[in-house]
């Protein structure tokens, strides 16, 4: 439905879109930062920028009826320029979780800030002991090795290699070692990389 001139948004004059004004108002409604060409909200990296394109389309479809694809592409590029941010700081004193921020001193806040990685799991101080997980570990590892694994998994939640340690799980096939990797994947998501030891053996530049 066509708008009357009185109903036109501030960023449209009847023929052209004022990109600067459009982007300013869009970012007020949808706060974002553009870091190294990728868009972030406080909830983390926007994996599918098509979502942003769809939001732009909703804004402009009331005043434009043709050339929408090109306009959306141009406005998305302009939004990235206006939302530019230098690289986000690496923070080793906190873990960004789905429902807020957990600090290494044991405190927690529901406040969120822009971060490189936000876990998709929520912090719950009253969560019950993971009995099934602990039972699995007791069947897989020696009792004294369980705290070591737990410590290493906790270490992986922080963006640091200060410990200069590597963990190797050695055993026969089919024992359940790979299930630990699945648990790590559910916690870390795309922040975790997997590969085979054969690639590391044959290519010293392979990701470990």
State what each model feature region is.
Residues 1-119:
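Intein modules and their embedded homing endonuclease domains
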Residues 29-54, 95-208:
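P-loop NTPase catalytic core of nucleic-acid-dependent motor ATPases
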